[in-house]
């Protein structure tokens, strides 16, 4: 099977175009791609397949060629904006602030896609500032390249349904250089020393036998065989999953490859994905024999088996599970939810029911911070471990209330999930607690998302009442969720962007953890601003013609922006401290 896969994939690799092997010819396929613009907005070329073409003009901040071409480019955009999508492309990876300042000073308002790693410009074979390229967003072929003076004729040809008469014209302008590419292609990139460590660190934990990914990246042969796919998912930013804007904040789980890592992988693929040395680091990786992230749990809570039919829409299920075996109060330091059948369990919410509780608890937090945080199941989420010296008290006799969301897959199955819980040593009482709040919108203030709206915004604000350290951010929307940003508005009138989830993906609902907790003063407002894509361009959209209400099911929508923090003066609550 692997040999056949390798043969097929190498044939596909040979068909890919890399500008390092020579200049790109007219109508040659470059592949799909995605980039963030100077405002941090995500643009995926395939999303624009309802346009006749995507038009790109090469921009650099100090380029006279860009300045000279800009007025005509703007005029053409004004004449053709209904049928064509216009961008500028910065192939030098210049800083976002400097590009934004350039856009502001020139007053054109055209989104500038910033190619930090030069991998898109290289694939497009961008050669000079001021150069214009026309990309077919369905075939991903460059149908015209040349000066702006030839653009009108090219667009008229495309508008008439004809091939571009003159697909390539010479262009003058400052030469675009590729120092990292040229340096890499002048040597042989080492699979064992350079490539395998990147794949091991960023891919192999999911792409392994028994992992959640669809194939195991456990050898050079597999990496080489899948190299065309690796290139495609890097170009479109589909993998690693759950990526956020790397220019905003510093997170432990941003899942963004560095510029150097992206270049190393793609240049290695361009060289033929060759192996060096006698050993294969990927084949030597060893994984724990258990899925439990922190060793064998101190307590395993078994969720009652849930029978899932082959078809149909399932109501949310409410289950209450006792913490069997907990005969004395214990402080919780970590927890993990292992789904019995990931194909049907979409997500869970949970809440602790203390002894004597009547069950009327919120699934959205905001309860006593002395209570423990038991992790829910969210696609792609990592097991939860409290910050150092932080925890909540699980009282003997407590129960766990679970809300389970299942989807059907065409086959009957039974989900038998488990929740692992790890305690602090007996007698140890952590000094700190976690708090937080959700910037949520519910039915009383919900505004239905209009039909066919590609970018419908919502926003909600929460206030941090005391000095606090921010720890994490969790966005939650459904199929139409597009993006979400969190911004701090400080009491002195200043503001700061905290995180930009530029390409929200319903399949990867992650809680993003700051590498270093961020101190904010009392009275800080945190604004979560998100947008929904209810257009037919959103391929996951169940019904673009529908006015979308708030609702629990995935074809309805939600808006949650959860924030976790730790108050500076937050120690044990009076009730617990007194015990």
Q: What do these predicted regions represent?
A:
Residues 1-10:
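Bacterial N-terminal signal peptides that target proteins for export
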């Amino acid at each position: 099977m692997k040999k056949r896969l390798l043969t097929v994939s190498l044939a596909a690799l040979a068909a890919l175009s890399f500008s390092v092997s020579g200049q790109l010819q007219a109508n040659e396929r470059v592949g799909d791609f995605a980039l963030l613009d100077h405002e941090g907005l995500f643009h995926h070329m395939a999303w624009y397949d309802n346009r006749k073409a995507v038009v790109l003009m090469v921009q650099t901040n100090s380029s006279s060629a860009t300045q000279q071409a800009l007025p005509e480019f703007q005029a053409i955009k004004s004449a053709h904006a209904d049928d064509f999508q216009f961008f500028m492309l910065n192939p030098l990876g210049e800083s976002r602030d400097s590009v934004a300042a350039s856009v502001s000073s020139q007053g054109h308002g055209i989104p500038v896609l910033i190619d930090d790693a030069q991998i898109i410009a290289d694939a497009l074979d961008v050669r000079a500032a001021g150069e214009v390229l026309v990309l077919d967003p369905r075939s991903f072929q460059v149908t015209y390249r040349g000066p702006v003076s030839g653009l009108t004729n090219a667009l008229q040809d495309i508008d008439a349904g004809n091939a571009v008469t003159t697909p390539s014209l010479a262009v003058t302008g400052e030469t675009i250089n590729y120092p990292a590419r040229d340096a890499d292609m002048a040597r042989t990139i080492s699979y064992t020393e350079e490539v395998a460590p990147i794949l091991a660190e960023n891919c192999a934990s999911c792409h392994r036998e028994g992992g959640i990914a669809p194939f195991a990246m456990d050898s050079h042969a597999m990496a080489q065989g899948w190299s065309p796919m690796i290139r495609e998912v890097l170009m479109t930013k589909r993998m690693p999953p759950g990526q956020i804007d790397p220019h905003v904040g510093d997170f432990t789980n941003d899942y963004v490859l560095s510029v150097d890592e992206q270049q190393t992988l793609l240049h290695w693929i361009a060289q033929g994905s060759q192996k060096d040395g006698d050993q294969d680091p990927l084949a030597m990786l060893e994984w724990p024999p258990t899925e439990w992230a922190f060793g064998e749990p101190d307590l395993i809570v078994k969720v009652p088996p849930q029978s899932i039919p082959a078809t149909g829409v399932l109501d949310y299920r409410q289950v209450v599970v006792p913490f069997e075996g907990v005969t004395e109060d214990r402080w919780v330091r970590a927890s993990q939810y292992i789904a019995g059948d990931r194909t049907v369990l979409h997500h869970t919410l949970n809440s602790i029911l203390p002894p004597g509780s009547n069950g009327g608890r919120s699934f959205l937090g905001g309860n006593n911070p002395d209570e423990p945080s038991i992790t829910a199941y969210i696609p792609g989420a990592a097991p939860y471990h409290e910050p150092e010296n932080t925890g909540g008290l699980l009282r003997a006799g407590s129960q766990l209330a679970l809300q389970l969301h299942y989807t059907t897959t065409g086959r009957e199955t039974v989900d038998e999930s488990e929740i692992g819980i790890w305690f602090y040593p007996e007698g140890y009482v952590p000094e700190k607690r976690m708090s937080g709040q959700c910037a949520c919108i519910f039915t009383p203030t919900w505004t239905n998302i209009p039909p066919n709206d590609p970018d419908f915004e919502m926003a909600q604000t929460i206030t941090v009442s005391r000095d606090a350290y921010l720890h994490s951010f969790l966005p939650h929307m459904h199929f139409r969720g597009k993006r979400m940003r969190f911004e701090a508005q400080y009491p002195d009138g200043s503001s700061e962007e905290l995180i930009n989830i530029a390409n929200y993906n319903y399949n990867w609902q992650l809680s993003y953890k700051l590498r270093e907790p961020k101190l904010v003063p009392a009275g800080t407002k945190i604004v979560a601003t998100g947008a929904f894509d209810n257009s037919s361009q959103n391929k996951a959209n169940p019904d673009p013609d529908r006015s979308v209400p708030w609702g629990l099911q995935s074809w309805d929508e939600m808006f949650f922006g959860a924030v976790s923090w730790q108050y500076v003066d937050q120690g044990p609550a009076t009730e617990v401290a007194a015990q």
